[in-house]
Amino acid sequence: MTASPISVIASANRLVAKVGSSLVTNEGRGLDRAAVAHWAAQIAALHKQGRQVVLVSSGAIAEGMARLGWRKRPSVMHELQAAAAVGQMGLCQAYEAAFAEHGLRTAQILLTHEDLADRHRYLNARSTLFALLRMGVVPIVNENDTVVTDEIRLGDNDTLGALVTNLIEADSLIILTDQRGLYEADPRKNPDARFISHAQAGDTALEAMAGGAGSGVGTGGMLTKILAAKRAAHSGAHTVIASGRERNVLTRLAQGECIGTELQATLPVWSARKQWMADHLRLRGRLVLDEGAVQALLNEGKSLLPIGVTEVQGDFERGDVVACVDASGRECARGLVNYASADARRIMRHPSSEITQILGSMTAPELMHRDNLVITE
């Protein structure tokens, strides 16, 4: 007799659970208090098992619209931000009351891309989250919609869930949605689409199946979840994408039951510092490399020398994070640059021995040192 597979969540001591808007709101009529209480009860059960849980929850804008009496989602950014500000009050109150029923305290954490892009703020957020977890508090995380603009948005709570997973070095990321998990095609369009129960995070076939980087929605909005799992895998975290409509899905996963799609972390695990560099979603520029430089980075573990750079794109300063791309524009690495863009343009295609002659001085022989870059291919 073959034993049933055990969910990767069963052994997770620290995990991040992301709950989408449809799982905490009442069809556009604000928060569903019963649903909020349901999630609180499950997380409380995990706490009793000695597990640490961070909850990434949507729902602020929907709650704000309900409180303001708006039936139609506004298109003006400042009105959306106002709705988020109003709704965050209700979201926090609902979770605070629900967790209090189980003797647990909650904390609100609102993050922006700039919080995570700045190294000092990143470390402060990390330390605060660790402190809350040690205290037995349940952190409830959301993007700070009240202050962000389209240019600096994290983008979605799937991405935020992965970033928080990396931030606290969680063992697992659980992305709860209104679908069963991943399919080989959109099940809403193809009822015969095959369900995927297990796969490897970072499998390029999954991204292609979901429509690729330019597809927008992809198969049922799954592309962002696949990319989030890939991001989380680089800190060693497994990801489960499952339906939040499943009864007691969190506690059942923790008991070892296989629900949804498991994406196992088989990618190289990055150090915390390299994870921070990789998690930059807003890059300051790009360096286009020749084939020799690409191979030196990918296969030889070398630093990036100016002679291997054929083009400098964007305006950036020394110490900014920029991407390294091949001639086709595909990113292969990213990291901290030793020279501002103006100087990088002057020394590109030149050997390091000529840097002093060109610039008058030499900060470093490399444009990007191998200790300050991370392979992202």
UniProtKB/Swiss-Prot annotation:
Q: Tell me which residues bind substrate.
A: S58, D145, N157
EC number(s) from the headed UniProt entry = 2.7.2.11
Q: Which PROSITE patterns match?
A: GLUTAMATE_5_KINASE, PUA
Q: Which GO terms describe its molecular function?
A: ATP binding; glutamate 5-kinase activity; RNA binding
Localized where? Cytoplasm
Under SMART domains, the record lists:
PUA (SM00359)
Q: Which GO terms describe its biological process?
A: L-proline biosynthetic process
Where is the PUA domain positioned along the sequence?
284-362
SUPFAM superfamilies this protein is in? Carbamate kinase-like (SSF53633), PUA domain-like (SSF88697)
In which broad location class does this protein mainly occur, judging by the first location in its UniProt entry? cytoplasm
Catalytic class of the enzyme: transferase
| Pathway as given in its UniProt record | Amino-acid biosynthesis; L-proline biosynthesis; L-glutamate 5-semialdehyde from L-glutamate: step 1/2
GO CC aspect terms: cytosol
- Primary role: Catalyzes the transfer of a phosphate group to glutamate to form L-glutamate 5-phosphate.
Q: What protein am I looking at?
A: Glutamate 5-kinase
What lineage does UniProt assign to this protein's organism?
Answer: Bacteria, Pseudomonadati, Pseudomonadota, Betaproteobacteria, Burkholderiales
Gene name in the database record: proB
